[in-house]
């Protein structure tokens, strides 16, 4: 059991651009009894936040719930017109280029459970996407297996953008396998006309971690819209997922 002495900042660490890795706050997390509360960082007072959390502060860093090193938050940098971020120096590379960091004890640690899907699992997910969204797999679609509740049976996440006729699907699907078939637990499917500019709301799986210490990982996701981005935290309740936090990010 983990107890939070005070509010803890949950950070996202993005090293997809190896020349410009950065760290930015996702949410302020506070645990009150059995309840975990999330609130957005105060982007209106960037200088105060930077003094408190950037400029040489070192944080534990995680990937898929496993501690893998530290992240040193350096000087603030501008990601867009409005943003709250800093350059970051990592003690070791992130396995998937994306990860989390915390300003205090927060994440219930476990080994990384993410793996590639088998040929049969991929085929089953392909059938599910065809049945549920009427789309076909493309090389741009990511499908991974991850054991969110650590019961030895993986869940499956399909994430990407696919054009089907005149419609573009920006989607994220979570499923489980039952007797050789996939069952959906969560579907996000933003549909837009292919010829329409500006209509973007792509939900990207960023990482996973047990934030509320209930034995089941939450999913941390990032929404990319036309002029910026924001964060989502998804929590599983029984056999479905729901968004329990929206906030942070930046844009113009």
PLM regions with names:
Residues 1-9:
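Sec-dependent N-terminal signal peptides
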Residues 9-252:
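Beta-propeller-forming repeat regions
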